[in-house]
Amino acid sequence: MKNSMIIILLFLAVNVVNGQEKDTRLDGLEEEIEQLIKTYNAIGLSVIVVENDKTVYSQGFGYRNLEKKLPVTENTSFHIASMTKAFTASLLGILEGEGRVSLTQKPSFYIPKFQFYNNEMDNLITIESLLSHKSGLGSLDGSLVLFGENNRLKSLAKLKYLKPNGKINDSWLYSNVGYTIVGTVAEQVTSKSWDENIEEKIFRPLNMNNSFTSLEKMKSSNNYSLGYGVSAGKVQNVSFEKYYDYSPAGAIKSSSKDIGNWMRTWLNDGSFNGKNVLPKDYVYSATSIQNIRDGGDSKGTFLFGDGFGWRMESRNGHYKVHHGGNTSGFSSIATLYPFSNLGIAILCNQQNSTLPYLILDLITNRMLELPRNAISDYPLIISDIYTDDNKIKGLNEEKKPTNELTNFCGKYFHKGYGTLEIVKKDNSLFVVYPNFTYRLEHLYYNTFKMKLDEGDAQILNPDFFELNFHQNNEGKIGSIKINLQYEPVEFIKETDK
């Protein structure tokens, strides 16, 4: 009888312990995710949830290669685009911890002969300014993408000819070129490439074995995802983006398992598996608001700002640290709730997709035990990729160009960007940049807009860019103004310089 009672008590104790350990917060999650994947016509994604320094959920969905039906796993590498910025910023934080860099120092202290557009910028912009998007540089992506170099120093030498887009240290203007600059600082200080530094100081210590800084290295692995997009309801394969000299702003490819290690490190004051990787003081600074920004009208969300490679806000009473990534064929998001010791990341192989954010909301509400939304409550927003409609329109007969099309042809130059060329082919004009070629569609008089050439990566929306050709005093085409910045940038025709 005594032995029987002991067995019964042990049985009850085990069941009580099991009842305490069983976590029902994510019950039914996979069914909801699969429903959203179907609704969004998505191909594949990977989800990871870490809590209290442990992985509590890790799952791949769909395919990394649709044609070959290769499944997504937790080790599948996706392009994470601007999520890269937190890695580059951390590299500077590590170097500061080593006493080799000061984030309050000017970049010219480390980069020989480096200059901004004017003395005010040279004197006031610091590495911190660049990391928190308050330098005033803003978007100079046309320079990075259309005129990209394979030499960062050569590319940065152009900045002294480019006007700022905002107030110095008193604005929030997202800037990829800012991260290109700080990545170059790291290279100058260490005499190693940005790629080598990221591998040595972050990937290896965090056991990020399926993370890469280049397409070539990623393709040498046996588990990476292709990129996809949707056009008119149909799925299309999308070319990978090549980052040229702006890799520090967005070139990393990683897996959800690796990002799980990355998030655990941030939630553990910079330590991973008992070893300090990121300085604790830097972790605090990077996840604190360094620059206030307008977050728009978002219900239940307040206090918007940027740290170093991360964005911050207060969501339903929880401090949220996050950053997304969007590039040709991929959309991703990583989010930390530091005071709940919770990290969530979703990597998706769909272009310009809100799907990762919907899944993030589903998981956040479950893990933090907030009111949940039904799947049907989420708006269906599917953004089509940019495609060439193959319908070449003729000239606007009511508002014809002032010159024959052949007179528009030639090379045009700007010191801060470089040289572009206008060529004529089959009665159409094309603009030829160093890295891309776009067909020009006539709008009115001497104004044209760019149209995608089939097969180009989904980096810039060409429809956004207009080319306004201007006549000189002799009535000849002498320059082009292109809306590459807030103020149009003028390229001078070389024969008329």
Positions of PLM-derived features:
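Bacterial Sec-dependent N-terminal signal peptides
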Residues: M1-T24
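Catalytic loop of the DD-peptidase/beta-lactamase superfamily, centered on the K-T-G motif
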Residues: Q20-Q59, E187-E200, R204, S239-K497
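Second-shell loop/turn segments in exported
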Residues: E21, S77-H79, Q115-N118, S143-L146, ...
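Short, conserved catalytic-motif segment at the N-terminal edge
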Residues: K22-F78, R100-S102, F109, F116-Y117, ...
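Short, charged, amphipathic alpha-helices and their helix-cap/turn boundaries
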Residues: L29, L144-K167, K192-N209, G229-N237
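Short, solvent-exposed loop/turn and secondary-structure capping segments
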Residues: S58-F61, L140-L146, T213-K217, P356-Y357
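Active-site helix/loop module of the DD-peptidase/beta-lactamase fold
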Residues: H79-M83, L95-G138, Y161-K163, T184, ...
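Catalytic nucleophile serine of serine hydrolases
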Residues: S82-M83, L173-N176
